[in-house]
């Protein structure tokens, strides 16, 4: 039996606020455009030959009630003015016949750039170690990125990140970021 190997993927993100945590999460999913799907969280493999679609094109592939596989990150707070972030990063190998990595990260107090770079770094490190590339945990992300690019084996990294500041009146604030696997 051959399993489902997605050929396409898209990134999405959203934020929701409500007095109830669950409703805040639902509103974040609605903001991301994926609330009408039955979401199944999967681990962090970017399939071989998978193509990243623009969000609008990917959304056309979804139907209400559809079982939909996602790599998703979420963060929530009801602490006023607290910065939260949810991010998913991807590292794509040059050889499209092998798999890459997706990584999810959620945090408090990190900007969009810091959280997004961290998710990319996680994905790139997982791919680099799979490919047998040099890995030095003491190097900065910029130094590692340069090594990976020079190796000519990792073609690109990117992320989708949603940040928000906790509601000033203490409502639940939830952020989500997702890689949605379709096709």
Predicted regions and their residues:
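Helix-coil modules at protein/domain termini and other flexible surface or pore-lining loops
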Residues: 1-183
